[in-house]
Amino acid sequence: MAKRTKKVGIVGKYGTRYGASLRKMVKKIEISQHAKYTCSFCGKTKMKRRAVGIWHCGSCMKTVAGGAWTYNTTSAVTVKSAIRRLKELKDQ
């Protein structure tokens, strides 16, 4: 694997190519895509990205569709909260 430095982190593999601002954008994306997330089914921090938009929990073996680089997208969170709010209004 390519050598990385303390300052640039995961994008050290690109060296001096592509420009600093583009590498900073890619760094943010790559950190979020390689991170482990909390599984919404079992609650463990085992949710890992398998492919673009495919997330797999190593503990409960559930596979779900999510965002390309993050487990939850902002639009999905908005829709989920709206559905929850509408269900609460319906129950009252």
Swiss-Prot record:
GO CC terms: cytoplasm; cytosol; cytosolic large ribosomal subunit; cytosolic ribosome; extracellular exosome; focal adhesion; nucleus; synapse
Known function: Component of the large ribosomal subunit. The ribosome is a large ribonucleoprotein complex responsible for the synthesis of proteins in the cell.
Assembly and oligomerization: Component of the large ribosomal subunit.
Organism: Homo sapiens (Human)
Protein name: Large ribosomal subunit protein eL43
One GO MF term: zinc ion binding
Entry's localization field: Cytoplasm
Keyword Chloroplast appears in the UniProt entry: no
UniProt key word Zinc: yes
Gene field: RPL37A
